[in-house]
């Protein structure tokens, strides 16, 4: 399988998806026809989200079709060379994909060789479940099971920093809560600016920041770019 799982879409001082474009270009390998899954977008319309994505990827020669705009979305996915899943609210994303019967077709086409690109919520959707999202559960997705294209859980936008005076839990504390009730999980705290690529049977960490792996009963393990999972 070919996957590009990004923690986030925007970095300080850079345009939207700018940091991801070289990574996308490297993994295209001749693929040009993409379907875009905009359902995580809540405060922007799906048309606007699709148009923004299409404009950014046009210089790479990628043609983007919003899956919400086609008559037969399952057929569109089955014929896609690239599946792009945008960030936003992960619960809304999973709910829409489940209700429209898109989870199995996405999994199948990626396993057959389509490239999967997802940022933030889109990276969460590639995991076995969405239980490591940071998002508010604004809708009920009727279960947390997701695509299971990547075997570990990703927590995008990972940071352990707290604002001065803030008394809420750190991100690691939230992750540790999940590991109490699901100790079988391995969770990757993927900070902004980092990504995971899956290509030719290998999953590789990229990006300038330290990533952390969390397991039940163990200290967090720091990982740097180039680490293979």
Swiss-Prot record:
Protein name: Peptidase E
Coiled coil: none
Record key words, sorted: Cytoplasm, Dipeptidase, Hydrolase, Protease, Serine protease
GO biological process annotation, one example: proteolysis
Keyword Secreted: no
EC number: 3.4.13.21
Functional note: Hydrolyzes dipeptides containing N-terminal aspartate residues. May play a role in allowing the cell to use peptide aspartate to spare carbon otherwise required for the synthesis of the aspartate family of amino acids.
Keyword hit for Hydrolase: yes
Catalytic activity from the UniProt record: Dipeptidase E catalyzes the hydrolysis of dipeptides Asp-|-Xaa. It does not act on peptides with N-terminal Glu, Asn or Gln, nor does it cleave isoaspartyl peptides
Primary localization: cytoplasm
First-level EC class: hydrolase
Pfam families named among the record's database cross-references: Peptidase_S51
InterPro entries from the UniProt entry: Class_I_gatase-like (IPR029062), Peptidase_S51 (IPR005320), Peptidase_S51_dipeptidase-E (IPR023172)
Catalytic residues (UniProt): 120, 135, 157
Gene3D superfamilies linked to this entry: 3.40.50.880
Record family assignment: Belongs to the peptidase S51 family.
GO cellular component, as recorded: cytoplasm
Localization terms from the record: Cytoplasm
Superkingdom as given in the UniProt entry: Bacteria
Organism the protein comes from: Shigella flexneri
GO molecular function (one): dipeptidase activity
């Amino acid at each position: 399988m070919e996957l590009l799982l990004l923690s986030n879409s925007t970095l300080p001082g850079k345009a939207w998806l700018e940091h991801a474009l070289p990574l996308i270009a490297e993994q295209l390998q001749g693929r040009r026809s993409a379907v875009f899954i905009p359902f995580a977008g809540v405060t922007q319309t799906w048309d606007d989200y699709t148009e923004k994505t299409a404009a950014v990827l046009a210089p790479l020669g990628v043609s983007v079709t919003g899956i919400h705009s086609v008559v037969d979305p399952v057929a569109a996915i089955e014929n896609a060379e690239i599946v792009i899943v945008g960030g936003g609210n992960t619960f809304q994303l999973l709910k829409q994909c489940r209700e429209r019967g898109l989870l199995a077709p996405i999994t199948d086409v990626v396993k057959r060789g389509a490239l999967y690109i997802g940022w933030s919520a889109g990276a969460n959707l590639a995991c076995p479940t969405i239980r490591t999202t940071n998002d508010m559960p604004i809708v009920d997705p009727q279960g947390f099971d997701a695509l299971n294209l990547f075997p570990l859980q990703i927590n995008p936008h990972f940071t352990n920093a707290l604002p001065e005076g803030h008394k809420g839990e750190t991100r690691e504390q939230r992750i540790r809560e999940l590991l109490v009730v699901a100790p079988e999980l391995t969770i990757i705290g993927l900070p902004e600016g980092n990504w995971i690529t899956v290509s030719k049977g290998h999953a590789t960490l990229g990006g300038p920041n330290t990533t952390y792996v969390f397991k039940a009963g163990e200290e967090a393990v720091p990982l740097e770019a180039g680490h293979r999972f």
